């Protein structure tokens, strides 16, 4: 049983889309299981349906307004570079309303429903053995995995949205009496869960470079420093998940194929730049193509 697993990574999901595009469309790889966290959860239903052109259009046409109903960031462009700072007005509004997050991502919830219909939901349930999204239950202090086979359409759309909510910059969601946030806080790349669900071969797309050692530019104010600290903690979670996944794969004799980004794509994956995301999609496609050619060359030797 073959599984496709995609990590979290915000706007870097466009790169994962490019890799998956090559694997599904040009290598004709058939997957039984689809598992993801955060932006990976957004990709899964469309990949299970084979809606690659639709997915490309979604990922290369979103902007900050597509995601945030209240944007906590201000993006300034200077000399073809982007500089991110806090949106003091919006953050102040949140404090006045006694909200616990700097921003809100209700527009993303609408975007998910707009691009994933109930008919597509039913078809996805039939096409794949399972589609699983990762969420973090902050109340219970545990990671949960939500299967499309166990959800209604409304619930599954809600879980996809929750899986992407990078608190405290996006919405903190209360559901079924518990408070939930981004699945990446607990498990950024659910390789081990794919093995637990019976996968015998896994293609895992990791939205980070294989060598995660690079110098970060730390923010000059508390808000941007917080963004950097969260990024650091997520990197450590990802390292742990990958090691854990590799060990589980060895133990269960599972074939594990890892697809990394060739370099650090961005310092802030909550900034959605159409031009960059189009470029990342192409980079992901080219990387998967090169990796396939290298594997073919090694077989011939």
Label the model's feature ranges.
Residues 1-37, 45-301:
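Patatin-like phospholipase
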């Amino acid at each position: 049983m073959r599984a496709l697993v995609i990590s979290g990574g915000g706007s870097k999901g466009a790169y994962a889309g490019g890799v998956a595009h090559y694997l599904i469309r040009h290598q004709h790889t058939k997957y039984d299981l689809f598992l993801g966290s955060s932006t990976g959860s957004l990709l899964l239903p469309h990949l299970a349906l084979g809606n690659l052109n639709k997915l490309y259009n979604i990922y290369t046409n979103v902007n900050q307004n597509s995601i945030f109903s209240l944007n906590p960031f201000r993006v300034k462009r200077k000399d073809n570079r982007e500089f991110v700072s806090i949106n003091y007005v919006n953050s102040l509004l949140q404090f006045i309303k006694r909200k616990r997050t700097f921003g809100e991502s209700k527009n993303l919830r609408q975007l998910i429903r707009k691009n994933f219909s109930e008919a597509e939901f039913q078809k996805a349930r039939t096409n794949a053995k399972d589609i699983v999204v990762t969420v973090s239950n902050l109340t219970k202090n545990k990671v949960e995995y939500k299967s499309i086979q166990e959800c209604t359409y409304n619930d599954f759309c809600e879980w996809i949205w929750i899986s992407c909510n990078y608190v405290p910059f996006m919405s903190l969601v209360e559901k079924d009496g518990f408070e939930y946030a981004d699945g990446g806080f607990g498990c950024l790349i659910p390789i081990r869960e794919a093995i637990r669900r019976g996968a015998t071969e896994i293609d895992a797309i990791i939205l980070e470079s294989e060598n995660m050692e690079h110098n970060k530019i730390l923010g000059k104010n508390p808000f941007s420093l917080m963004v950097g600290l969260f990024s650091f903690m997520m990197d450590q979670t990802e390292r742990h998940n990958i090691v854990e996944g590799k060990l589980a794969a060895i133990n269960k004799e599972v074939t594990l194929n890892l697809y990394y980004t060739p370099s650090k794509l961005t310092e802030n994956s909550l900034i959605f730049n159409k031009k960059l995301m189009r470029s990342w999609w192409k980079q992901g496609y080219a990387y998967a193509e090169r990796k396939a050619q290298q594997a073919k060359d090694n077989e011939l030797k």
